[in-house]
């Protein structure tokens, strides 16, 4: 699991790679990047939305400002497993994230069943405000994927992730039900994301140019909704 950070801001850019681009890039990253200590991990999320899917639709419209609320775990959780309640906002290309950690069962009861958590931090209050603002957020989708994370050997603020086997379901969204779902991308495709506190190093921009890897506007949740989720069933 990645180190826990309650508040941060950064630039995030996604890239959709085919198998040849992934293999070429992976082969030259080792001198610059090191693997996350956990190696490959499975990340599971519940995304929350209004009954008319307002947040998914706004995300797909590529607005200047957008936000999302999700509950994240590493692997299929049990009630006592650690989980992250995340409020993620993006404004003019900068990502601002607020997140708190609590047992999955407690987080689920809060976000899905409306039971107030023990947590009373400022971040918890911001999340509670968002729940109140939208009024009727429901568990809209479970979305899971397998991730390999790399960290820069020189710049602690630079991170690259590779997500494969992205799958989702609109029913039985409780993550305790497993990490299965319909595939969002082709098996040969990899979603890469570069996360940085500032500009990218020259060696990385040179690699992206050499392998013709270009930025892509891609939201996992919005893409799943737009591709398959025209009749999403909200499940608790």
Model-found features: residue ranges?
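Phosphate-end processing signature that detects enzymes handling 5′-triphosphorylated RNA
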Residues: 1-236
């Amino acid at each position: 699991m990645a180190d826990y950070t309650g508040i941060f801001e950064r630039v995030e850019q996604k890239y959709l790679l085919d198998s040849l681009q992934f293999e070429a890039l992976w082969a030259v990253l080792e001198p610059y990047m090191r693997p996350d200590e956990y190696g490959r991990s499975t990340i599971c999320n519940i995304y929350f939305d209004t009954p008319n899917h307002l947040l998914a639709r706004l995300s797909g419209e590529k607005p200047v400002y957008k936000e999302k609320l999700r509950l994240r775990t590493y692997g299929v959780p049990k009630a006592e497993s650690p989980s992250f309640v995340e409020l993620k906002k993006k404004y003019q290309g900068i990502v601002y994230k607020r997140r708190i950690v609590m047992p999955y069962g407690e987080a689920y009861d809060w976000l899905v069943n409306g039971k107030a958590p023990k947590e009373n931090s400022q971040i918890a209050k911001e999340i509670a405000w968002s729940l109140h603002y939208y009024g009727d957020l429901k568990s809209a989708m479970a979305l899971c994927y397998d991730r390999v994370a790399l960290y820069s050997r020189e710049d602690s603020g630079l991170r690259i992730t590779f997500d494969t086997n992205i799958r989702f379901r609109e029913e039985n969204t409780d993550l305790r039900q497993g990490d299965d779902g319909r595939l969002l991308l082709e098996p040969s495709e990899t979603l890469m994301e570069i996360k940085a506190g500032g500009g990218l190093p020259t060696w990385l921009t040179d690699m992206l140019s050499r392998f013709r890897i270009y930025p892509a506007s891609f939201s996992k949740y919005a893409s799943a909704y737009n591709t398959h989720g025209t009749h999403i069933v909200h499940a608790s």
